[in-house]
């Protein structure tokens, strides 16, 4: 199975053991394993999405232009950019979609974020609108 290295880990926040679905998602999203107090940890899906929600709501984002219609900025294609909603790594095509639809990337806490196809389709998760940080 492709998530075996994550199968026996616990979530870094809620301390629950990862089930097979969360282990596979960690593998697909290339989540790095962290070591806390001598234990290896990853993150479950609900904690990851809650953490990303807090990041979007507590820290105001800064827009980053992905490049003009004819030429993408070189850093966009070579750097890892994660989805601001689900935490997955954006593919080359997903980065291109940002450029072609003139949708900005956003920086939260020095990390560039965008939206993946799954979080874009059917309007389930709308583009980020800059709002003041919650007090």
From Swiss-Prot:
One annotated GO molecular function: DNA binding
Zn-finger (unnamed) residues: 11-47, 83-119
Keyword list, A-Z: Activator, DNA-binding, Early protein, Host cytoplasm, Host nucleus, Host-virus interaction, Inhibition of host innate immune response by virus, Metal-binding, Modulation of host cell apoptosis by virus, Transcription, Transcription regulation, Viral immunoevasion, Zinc, Zinc-finger
Gene3D superfamilies in the record: E6 early regulatory protein
Short name of one Pfam family: E6
Gene Ontology biological process terms in this record: DNA-templated transcription; regulation of DNA-templated transcription; symbiont-mediated perturbation of host apoptosis; symbiont-mediated perturbation of host ubiquitin-like protein modification; symbiont-mediated suppression of host innate immune response; symbiont-mediated suppression of host type I interferon-mediated signaling pathway
Compartments, record wording: Host cytoplasm; Host nucleus
GO CC aspect terms: host cell cytoplasm; host cell nucleus
InterPro entries (UniProt xref): E6 (IPR001334), E6_sf (IPR038575)
Domain of life: Viruses
Family named by the database record: Belongs to the papillomaviridae E6 protein family.
Function according to Swiss-Prot or TrEMBL: Plays a major role in the induction and maintenance of cellular transformation. E6 associates with host UBE3A/E6-AP ubiquitin-protein ligase and modulates its activity. Protects host keratinocytes from apoptosis by mediating the degradation of host BAK1. May also inhibit host immune response.
The protein's assembly and partners: Forms homodimers. Interacts with ubiquitin-protein ligase UBE3A/E6-AP; this interaction stimulates UBE3A ubiquitin activity. Interacts with host BAK1.
Name of the protein in its database record: Protein E6
Species whose genome carries this gene: European elk papillomavirus
Taxonomic lineage from the root: Viruses, Monodnaviria, Shotokuvirae, Cossaviricota, Papovaviricetes
Name of the gene this protein is made from: E6
